[in-house]
């Protein structure tokens, strides 16, 4: 499954696609877990192990695709009024994606351990008589044989060794692929960690700007208050001066009137 681009910058549709992928990853992880539980039982078979590998690789591709979608979602432009809501939505998607990845990586590691255990049993059973009862009849036939005459046993021994080597190579190839896929998921975890860190820096910057704006508003209000106080004091002083001048004029007028009288 290859990565397909977003949905024309529509955040709602992109968020829906991310949520859908997260649900698929969770569902696939549960299916992988059920398949792992069948290994070593009568239901075990080479076909079952092949299905397990295909399901694991499909889920790994889903995880890579979702990682790209979340990056795209985080880079979409937004208005100041929608910024907080967009952050809440992205935080929720990242948290859900992280939870689904954690569970998926858990079953990945279980699958790798099961494959390693199987290879070890095949190697051991190729050196001793008899097989291992945990594996299915199809795979058990590759490494077990019945007591026969010495020439027949030697011939069968050679056939089993060749089949065992082929089986070991297949399983070791599967182990290498699983380990590579686990590393891919580790890289996605790093991406998510970086996104959370960068988003935190952006939010801190926004909050700092808001705080600075609030400080500026408070300072402006204080300056306006001081200006109003100064204006009131100036008016009061002017009124007092005018009152004194009026009194002075009246007194001078009375003095002049008294002299003339």
Curated annotation (Swiss-Prot):
Location of region: Disordered: 129-150
Q: Which residues form a coiled coil?
A: 47-69
Top-level taxonomic group: Eukaryota
Q: Which GO terms describe its cellular component?
A: azurophil granule; early endosome membrane; endocytic vesicle; endomembrane system; immunological synapse; late endosome; perinuclear region of cytoplasm; recycling endosome
Q: Which CDD domains match?
A: SNARE_syntaxin7, SynN
| Phosphoserine, modified sites | 45, 75, 125-126, 129, 205
Positions carrying N-acetylserine are 2
Gene3D superfamilies, A to Z = 1.20.5.110, 1.20.58.70
Membrane topology is: Single-pass type IV membrane protein
Q: Which family does it belong to?
A: Belongs to the syntaxin family.
User: Can you say what this protein is called?
Assistant: Syntaxin-7
Gene of this entry: STX7
